[in-house]
From Swiss-Prot:
Broad class of where this protein is predominantly found: mitochondrion
PPR repeat intervals: 75-109, 111-145, 146-180, 181-215, 216-250, 251-281, 282-316, 317-351, 352-386, 387-421, 424-454, 457-491, 492-526, 527-561, 562-596
Species lineage: Eukaryota, Viridiplantae, Streptophyta, Embryophyta, Tracheophyta
Species assigned in the record: Arabidopsis thaliana (Mouse-ear cress)
Keyword vocabulary terms for this entry: Mitochondrion, Repeat, Transit peptide
Family (UniProt): Belongs to the PPR family. P subfamily.
Compartment list: Mitochondrion
A Pfam family the protein falls into: PPR_3
Protein name (database record): Pentatricopeptide repeat-containing protein At2g17525, mitochondrial
Record: transit peptide: 1-66
GO cellular component, one term: mitochondrion
InterPro entries named among the record's database cross-references: Pentatricopeptide_rpt, TPR-like_helical_dom_sf
Gene3D superfamilies the UniProt entry points to: Tetratricopeptide repeat domain
Amino acid sequence: MLRILKLSTSSRSVPLTRLWLLQLPCFCSSSSSSSSLLSVPSDDHIVRLILDQKSASGALETFRWASTFPGFIHSRSTYRALFHKLCVFRRFDTVYQLLDEMPDSIGLPPDDAIFVTIIRGFGRARLIKRVISVVDLVSKFGIKPSLKVFNSILDVLVKEDIDIAREFFTRKMMASGIHGDVYTYGILMKGLSLTNRIGDGFKLLQIMKTSGVAPNAVVYNTLLHALCKNGKVGRARSLMSEMKEPNDVTFNILISAYCNEQKLIQSMVLLEKCFSLGFVPDVVTVTKVMEVLCNEGRVSEALEVLERVESKGGKVDVVACNTLVKGYCALGKMRVAQRFFIEMERKGYLPNVETYNLLIAGYCDVGMLDSALDTFNDMKTDAIRWNFATFNTLIRGLSIGGRTDDGLKILEMMQDSDTVHGARIDPYNCVIYGFYKENRWEDALEFLLKMEKLFPRAVDRSFKLISLCEKGGMDDLKTAYDQMIGEGGVPSIIVSHCLIHRYSQHGKIEESLELINDMVTRGYLPRSSTFNAVIIGFCKQDKVMNGIKFVEDMAERGCVPDTESYNPLLEELCVKGDIQKAWLLFSRMVEKSIVPDPSMWSSLMFCLSQKTAIHVNSSLQDIIQS
């Protein structure tokens, strides 16, 4: 058994590593004599010193050292601090030894605070049997375990296994004559909610009511959160109506849940009720409401929500403000976004890198590339460090906007930047797309070749696919492409272009359409030289109407068809003698300011020649007028 109090009181017994402590004012007597006795340290000082130790041995050493002071007797507080450190380092045998010694050392048994500390220590170590055994440990000292001890054990058990916790509640707590309080039921509700046992949660709520324990807001909110997490927001709303005193957390849970389901009306109704009861939702909830409003294009209403929260003393942060900036940018209202940006600074919500990135993206989307570059340069002036998203957004915008050479300059800056670590292929693919869009095929291939040092596997796969598109078999091509995708690779626009042509030539139109959809999803609009191959593929399969619809779809997506887009369709219709559809298609083409080439005139004239002279003259007159 350890003996704490019978250690030598000589200052020479103080460990060398602790001698500096003797110089602390709190440990020195007021006498200037070198032979004066040291004053007795307080419990708080010793507790702090024990808790500051970085090892179990250090904590024990400090504890023993404190015993060397004449007149100092350890208290429950110092023992509790030592138990905490010993539990942190899992010295549980020493904990038991010191517990046995406590009554003799200080004349007092351990109290609830000490037992709770030990329970939590066992819990952190996941020693569930030892956690439960604390009940017997308390009884060993002739003390009846208190409700606080039982609740502490229960709190550990619900995090580990709700079934063990329920069994403990029934067989230990209730069998000992301990009646749970609202905190007890709150712990059980937490365990049931964590395991999504919502039905049992409602049963527990009913047991509380019949037992005369009124559920508080914490109990209700725990069950509400579980309901919302499982998508049962309507049932959560009904449960909320039972609450006599919902609090701000209640509204935060339900408003956020409705926002997650994009149910704007319900979230706004609850927001109004929240305000009317004098509550202000937290900044996370406010941001979610604003985000849903902005997604619906109702940015002005989102601004009103923000201003109401501010006027009621609620907290607003830069993330909430960024939501508005993003909303304005999505609507193309860049001047308003810029004004709000300035207002953010005036109110003390300092813009961060995300704010600037949103503005850059917004300017790029509306074609204001010079403003995007100015914002990029402002970041350096305002001491905002560029990150990968900054570079990637600007390179993408410049490349898509027809300024690939400027995008290349930004790419070079990114390569030299110390804020971007590790090469990522996205901005490089953006540059390739820029070359593709500007019909600079040689530059695109040369750039792809230069990428080999940074992305050897991706470049090797790309050239292999391009080669297979030229002269390989379809099975080999599919295998190589699937392998690239399986490895997480993203094909460049050059690879996609080649694949679309090869698939379309071999009648695999569905595969071609998937590639085009993938391009559009990534923001890369294919040129007519790419999607014309699909149109020819439709015509070969005698699916002219599918081809016509495809052209219309591509035009709606922002792609620009050309003469070669309509030529195979018109020719196929004319061969079939369908003059009405041919003429309608020809008219649509002319309306889009696409000038027909000689072959199209020939096809149309051939088709007309099959009709009567009167019909031919009438149609020719319509063509001339067009």
